[in-house]
Amino acid sequence: MPRDFPLDRVRNIGIAAHIDAGKTTTTERILFYSGVVHKIGEVHDGAAVTDWMAQERERGITITAAAISTAWNDHRINIIDTPGHVDFTIEVERSMRVLDGVIAVFCAVGGVQPQSETVWRQADRYSVPRMVFVNKMDRTGADFLKVYGQIVDRLKAKAAPIQLPIGAEGDLSGIIDLVANKAYIYKNDLGTDIEEAEIPADMADEAAEWRAKLMESVAENDEELIEKFLETGELTEAELKKGIRDGVLKHGLVPMLCGSAFKNKGVQLVLDAVVDYLPAPIDVPPIQGVLADGSEAVRPSDDNAPFSALAFKVMADPYGKLTFVRMYSGVLSKGSYVMNSTKDVKERISRLVVLKADDREEVDQLRAGDLGAVLGLKNTTTGDTLCDPDNSIVLETLFIPEPVISVAVEPKTKGDMEKLSKALTSLSEEDPTFRVSTDEETGQTVIAGMGELHLEILVDRMLREFKVEANIGAPQVSYRETIRSSSKGEGKFARQTGGKGQYGHVVIEMEPGEPGTGFEFINKIVGGAVPKEFIKPAEMGMKETCESGVIAGFPLIDVKCTMVDGSYHDVDSSEMAFKIAGSMAFKDGVKKCNPVLLEPMMKVEVEVPEDFLGSIIGDLSSRRGQVEGQSIDDGISKVSAKVPLAEMFGYATQLRSMTQGRGIFSMEFSRYEEVPRNVAEAIISKNQGNS
């Protein structure tokens, strides 16, 4: 089956931004103008095509990354609409991993928000070329150039406006195209009657000034163009387009566009810019991976190369499990067998589909550069590599953040027990930041996630999709333990009960590890003080104790254990005895190494009318928060602070009552920090009382 679009005419793009910047509305308009939908759907009406979960349509927010294919100007455009709420960061993370380019949407009034910075960092992590669409230019307080300044200052981006708005707020009537040096005037509400015109006389000087700045920015990235620009002070439209595209691909330029998706202004120009400036799969570096022998290799974006793809999302579906894949090389055919090289198992490809939100089109093949979904995979989860069984490779996987909040969950009736187990398994397969575990002390099922809204939506889905009624406990913070100094630890387990006894003896040196290393074990036993077969059980004993904690029952992180000595008995020693001795040595060492409790600190940003600033700062301080910055803009105060997650439960309700419903806030995980001694003592005694 031949390609319907050559690779250089394929664009895999994401639409990403902070909550309420208008990403989903922008996607809706793109689908309308490119002919995928024939009626415009609004987020606030609960009719958006890409918001296809019941919860998304009710809440007016996008939770999961919906993948949709469309076409524009003879190009195939595969779009992923990502959520802007910080609790759903994994959805943005996994879409960034598989995209070639991003449209970052900003609100012309709100500008750069905390979540915009998070999304920008994620795009940086995966080196994704991007362009900016400043949306909501029709809103009161809209200011395109103010947002430009914020993007340069706060995101340190090499932004370059390639458009200017004609009018703003209620008077937005058109857009100046600085590349073509002309204006587009919108003649009807649907945005389908557009007149090409001269730049309005009252904006000619401003447009000339910004066009000169654009030519300078473009020329800086290209030696030939800079020579011509210095000689003539002018670049042609074709030179500008080529220069902007080269700058975007080299991460040296971020073109900025403007408009109002809701008012149907500027969206077709965004599509033109996607085609003109964002990369095709062949324009980005080939994907890297590791071969079976451990050596590094690359897979070019080519139908003739060996097949390789990355599973970036798993979704429960009425027709079975859908696994979304990004094709990097080769061809994937329906009915074929492939290798999951991450798990070293073979999988059969039952069916292949291309998605248009909750509508789907079955296809016989997916090719290099495609985004599609596979039905029938049994063992594949998010981040796994699928490849040609004869040309095995493991591709770079995803960064998956650790959950910061947990709640106990139990079925309301015994009959729901099995359904609950099924629901939790299915939801954790879909979402790698959603973890399920069993509390060994209480036997309770504990679910963990990225925030209150994240868990609320998942519990809601259990009820709607799996018909499971469950009781939910109070949220619990995911504390961690660590050590601050070094010491030796010793564990000796000896038991004689007639006949064969038990004997294991372990001596370790314990010290703080590098941040992010978790548990690290080094074996330095020499001279056979402990036989080789007992080293691994001793390590396992330490590791299990590390996972269950020592001072308050929370996992220990960043600890390095070196096994230096021990002893054994020819008859009585066993793997179990050394596992227990390893655990005893670990506990002994931790107690001597100045153990401390760590808690998740959240980066909190609050926006309130100026009159409420004093009470907001006072309230944050009472929550053990540290205010790190504040600014006032147009009567709105912005406060940024670091606050322990433990103090933030119920903050949304409190903020509403303090500001008469006029305050908003966002919160995302920052890092783990030591809990103050008086607070730690209360947590430790409470947890020791529970155990």
Swiss-Prot record:
Q: What is its main location?
A: cytoplasm
- Amino acids binding GTP: 17-24, 81-85, 135-138
- Record-level Gene Ontology MF annotations: GTP binding; GTPase activity; translation elongation factor activity
Record's keyword terms, sorted: Cytoplasm, Elongation factor, GTP-binding, Nucleotide-binding, Protein biosynthesis
Q: What's an example Gene Ontology biological process for this entry?
A: ribosome disassembly
Where do the tr-type G domain residues begin and end?
8-282
| Listed PROSITE patterns | G_TR_1, G_TR_2
Domain of life per record: Bacteria
GO CC annotation, single = cytoplasm
Localization:
Cytoplasm
**Pfam families tied to this protein:** EFG_C, EFG_III, EFG_IV, GTP_EFTU, GTP_EFTU_D2
> Can the keyword Disulfide bond be found in this entry's annotation?
no
Role according to the record: Catalyzes the GTP-dependent ribosomal translocation step during translation elongation. During this step, the ribosome changes from the pre-translocational (PRE) to the post-translocational (POST) state as the newly formed A-site-bound peptidyl-tRNA and P-site-bound deacylated tRNA move to the P and E sites, respectively. Catalyzes the coordinated movement of the two tRNA molecules, the mRNA and conformational changes in the ribosome.
Please report which protein family the annotation says this sequence is part of.
Answer: Belongs to the TRAFAC class translation factor GTPase superfamily. Classic translation factor GTPase family. EF-G/EF-2 subfamily.
Q: Tell me what this protein is called.
A: Elongation factor G
Organism phylogeny: Bacteria, Bacillati, Cyanobacteriota, Cyanophyceae, Synechococcales
